[in-house]
Amino acid sequence: MSEAVWPSALFIGFLIVQRLAELALARRNTARLLARGAVEHGAAHYPLIVALHASWLAAIALLGWGEPVRPFWLAIFVLLQALRLWILGTLGPRWTTRIIVLDEPLVRRGPFRVLRHPNYTLVVAEIAVAPLVLGLGWVALVFSALNAAVLGIRIRSENAALYPR
């Protein structure tokens, strides 16, 4: 592997490992929440979210391999990871990639004091920023538009589950 490929390979590898680790954590947390009596909502649209994120990762991996890393966008990406850690730390065992509702009060500390859906804010930013790290502006644009459509469905479903009338 040439020296020019290493930075993009490391970045792409990080994205893939991070997403796989998140899926493992989400699976564990989901099972534990369901065992405690939680209920899943909006399961029908979950495969669409998985397909979107898998396609996004594939586009970055295939088109970004060997591309130079842009330091400005990498710095923004690193800041977004700090937000991710804050969200994960705040939600703890209640964090999942699905809409799992437990009959307990909503979390209102940490980033949830200022944002209703901080994880979606993070994902919106990350779907745009990660491709920009490798100069893939059109990937950022296309997947941001697709993500906006999917998030519209997702947020309506989550709001209906968390804030019933």
Give each language-model segment a name.
Residues 1, 42-71:
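Long, highly hydrophobic alpha-helical transmembrane signal-anchor segments
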